[in-house]
Amino acid sequence: MIKIAVLGYGTVGSGVVEVIEKNHDSINKKAADDIEIKYVLDLRDFPGDPVEKVLVHDYNVILNDPEVSIVVETMGGLHPAYEFTKQALEAGKNVCTSNKELVAEYGTELVRIAEKKDINYLFEASCGGGIPIIRPLNSSLTADEIDEIDGILNGTTNYILTKMAVDGLDFDEALKEAQQNGYAERNPEADIEGYDACRKIAILSSLAYGAHVDYRDIYTEGITKITATDIKYAQSLGASIKLLATSKKVHDGFYAMVSPVMINAHNPLYSVQGVFNAIFIHGNVLGDAMFYGSGAGKLPTASAVVADVVDCAKHLHKHIIMNWSSRPLKLMDIENVRNRFFVRMEGCMAQEIVRVNSVFGDVESFSVPGITGEFAFITEKMPEHEFREGITQLKGIRSTIRVGF
């Protein structure tokens, strides 16, 4: 029998308990052993909940119990999750987590400890919720050199942008609805400013490229400046606006960024709606592949965590090699990355386009019926720094968004 402990009985932790209880027989068959939850750690009490039978408030009870071989960390945040995880690994216990903040910050260190102890630190649920992506990167795609990852990695922002596009809501209205429906936190900053997606693309890039990508080095821009008018312009082009997390190999370098991007129907991420996530990967042998599914939520995330528990159970005394070196990967300066740009500008298109062309060369200019006093244009591909320099020469700029077609 394999005994596990769950740290945290919140949304994901309670989901882990539920999944193990609900699918107990099939999980045990796949693990080739019986998996039993011996402890659940939480500061709170849960009167009337069956979890009370295994509930403890002192982490040392778990740490000092030699029967516990797998620890499931679903506490979230950096502290004390980091200290508890490190102590568990150093004590020879496998750890599975859904905590992207912890993995992005301390992943290299924790993977190294697990390697030295010949145990495992697994984090499938940290990047795509219920979407299997870490395991494919680490095993199924090992024959490939990955040269591009593009993802919709945050369900909250995708839900907001979908509501703006489908229902014509402005940003604040869509955010409020997301909060009312439980898709956004009371403090949504990590989601809407792109920080959550940034940590996830850092983890995926580290595994894909075999070196450590520091999330602090990734250019990150959220969706708070996207307006209902921006959405209307995109729709007039047969396009949609998505918060994309991207990392890409360019010649001998790599870049990574998170930002709103206008994409059209030729992009496989175009049709990803609501709280769903999707991750597009290009390999030099495989070509294109896309992973799609529920990117968040209690049971989808718990499903990925329990899959890691089963993996740990099958490799109790053997470390699963992770292609994640502690060697830092130096990213390209984002100012040298080339993109096309959508620009909304005040004024009459017929009068202003000569000035625009004098700055950016020939552009694709257009207007949308019903929107007055402004027009829009799309530039050719150019380095980010050239665009920033050019845009300062024009007055009345209302919006700028990168274009992926």
Language model region names:
Residues A81-Q87, A91, K100-N138:
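Rossmann-fold NAD(P)-binding glycine/threonine-rich loop
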Residues N94-C96:
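A short hydrophobic/small-residue beta-strand
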Residues P268-N323, K330-N336:
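ATP-dependent carboxylate/acyl-activation modules
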Residues M1-E90:
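N-terminal glycine-/serine-/threonine-rich beta1-alpha1-beta2 phosphate-ribose binding loop
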Residues L175-S271, F276-A278:
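Substrate-binding/catalytic subdomain of NAD(P)-dependent oxidoreductase enzymes
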Residues V309-F405:
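A conserved regulatory-domain signal marking ACT and ACT-like small-molecule sensing domains
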Residues V68, E115-D196, I203:
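Rossmann-like NAD(P)H-binding beta-loop-alpha module
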Residues L7, E73-M75, S98, E105, ...:
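Structural motif
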